[in-house]
Amino acid sequence: MNFDLTDDQEMMRDMFARFLDENSSMARVRAAAPGGFDPDLWRGLAEQGALSIRVPEDAGGLGLGLFDATLLMTEAGRTLVSGPLAEALVAARLLAQSGAQPDLLERVLAGDAVVTIALHDIATTPQQWVAGASIAEAVIARRGADVVLVTLAAADQKAERNLADTPIAHIDFTGREGAPLAIASADFDAGVEEWKLLISAGLAGLSKESLRLASAYAGERKQFGQFIGQFQGISHPLADLVCEADGGTMLVWKAILNIADGSKEAGAAVSIAAWWNAIAAARCVAQALHTFGGYGLTTEYDIHLFNLRAKAWPLVYGDPALLLDEAGRRLYAGETASLPPAGDCPIEFDLGEDAAQMTREIDAFFTSQVSDEERSHFHYSWEGFVPTVHKKLADAGLLFPGLPGDLRGKKLSHYAQMAAMDAFEHHGYNNPAANVTQMVALIIHRFGSDELKADVLPRLMQGEAICSLGYSEPGSGSDVFAAQCKATPEGKGWRIDGTKMFTSGANLSSYVLMLCRTNTEVAKHAGLTMFIVPLKAEGVTVQPVYTFQDERTNITFYDNVRIPDSWRLGEVDGGVKTMSASLELEHGGGFGKYMRKMLDAGVAACRQISRNGKPLIEQQQAQARLARTAAHLWLAELITFRAQWVIAEKKANLAYGPMAKMFSSEKFLTDARDLLDLTAPDSLSLRPGPTAELNLFYRHAQGATIYGGTSEVHRSMIAERNLGLPRTRA
């Protein structure tokens, strides 16, 4: 797995960034209006090699890949470059491919002439808006099965005021022959697909910069005596959107990798990247402008320039919703697409051979060792705990793949650990019982007494006992540091009194990991201590609490419960340090595997259900909504991959784990609702089959945004650690 650029790509990106910071400043962008073209900037880009980046070397270009071109476009988007760069890059490659008019190509690469493209077939759309046509010498266009170069007259090059002062023009191609180019129509179509990715990259760069400007302003502007970035009404929407902006870049990368690998998803990936970035850019700039308040509406502040370009750049193609329709047809109606040459792509989402081996080992276990009767009890919650399967996994050495080698006896790479978790989820048995017990085993190993290590730890490791967590309390919820359950020294041990809420699995577990208040005279986070408490101890009461997710949790009461001091974990009042040991098991996880199964159920339901005499899967609105769910799934997986990659490779981590959890849980919930709507009223049924599965996923998704840290907590972490906003929590 890799999310890093090559050294050469880093150097190239930095070169373009420095050049554009100086030559596409906001002052230069403003000066280029109303025509929207900066000829000096354009010639400078040519000198930097930007215009020749996709032209083969034997035609005088750099011969670089599509990925390299998107790096340029990301910087161009960040600086609102004044000129039809995405269109010119595609036109230059097509002109070079045709071998026609080498003199014109030479002037294009030198920045002395502009050639652009018409995005729609002029045989069926003879009149259309063309980006860059107000300053271009010629337009490359498709006319049915032919590709032609149409020279523009002075009368065509008529600058026209438009939404964002970009150099577009409305061209009537009726009756214009144009010079034939030796290019197949499929090659031209591939150029349009390339344009979609280039403009997507530009929009992603624009989106990130608009959020950066908004965050910087929110960190210096004060209202009511506080920086406005401390208000969650400001910081939380920005946290949502940085996930969408980052996701836009990753969708572009996925599409390029899919093209390079020949994936059947490649065409749909292009459409989804273009749709997503068009929508996300509009959302990002709108929220960024809102952050500036009334000042954002004035022309004195640069944010309005981002707002206008975010809409203008993609709309030259048409309604972005059509791109989602296109993705739906490519995913579910067999529509194919001509795709451009990708070139080298450094990004890789494969986990490697050791991870593949771990997956095969777990697959073999579930195939040979798990009976149908055992499998029938599987469930995403604690209710799916099957003691016999748990014990067999322990005997096979597969129960706790996330534990470090010094405890487990066999060191696994982080990627193999990830693959194991994914494989369990694939088989429906990534059970909370094992995950929580794994965490408790690690804490005992690190902080437990000799007695705990001798008596409790072996039982956990051998699959003979499981543990639950006693963190939350009725009055504190996610604020674990507000715990009031007391542990009072008594003789050579402790007396525990209090209540814990959402002690899931306490009815099944032998032990509970307790966070207790041991000191009320210090800061609340400093007066906590960790204990292991046997749930069969006298004074412990477990009372069920049922949720509408088909899941049981518990409220547990501790009345004069006595344990020896040897069952304490770590130092007295050192509970926070003890709890931090569990961070070694942080996987930056999300809900991608559940989302994938939910999408599969949605597709299956749409194949079964008919509306107006036609299967739902054949209807455009159904295809588009399934495609939107697929987009959210792909992004959830990509954001999670990045979170896991930075952990494995020890890279800078800008709250990537919280981003993965928050984004995936929120989209899991919205898509679960939408798929129920799409398949209604059949989706009301709990008959065995895909609609029953959609019901279950809808119930499951309700809690996804709550447990493991609420979305609100994660949004605050993202705002602070990724966007640099002031701390919003006490």
Task: List PLM regions with ranges.
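A short core secondary-structure module
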Residues: A118, T125-N162, I168, D497-T541
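Amphipathic, small/basic residue-rich leader segments at the start of a protein or domain
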Residues: M1-S82, E326-A434, D455, R459, ...
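A structural signal for short hydrophobic beta-strand segments in well-ordered beta-sheet cores
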Residues: C485-T488
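C-terminal helix-coil-helix/basic helical segment that borders enzyme active sites and/or dimer interfaces
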Residues: S25-G36, S215, Q223-Q226, V242-W276, ...
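Glycine-rich beta->alpha junctions and the first turn(s) of the following alpha-helix
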Residues: N2-M12, A50, G77-R78, K158-D246, ...
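A short, Trp-centered hydrophobic/proline-enriched beta-strand micro-motif
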Residues: A110-A123, A141-R142, G463-Y471
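Glycine-rich phosphate/cofactor-binding loops in nucleotide/flavin-utilizing enzymes
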Residues: N2, F16, L71, V90, ...
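N-terminal glycine-rich flavin-associated loop
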Residues: G83-G99, P432-E451, G477
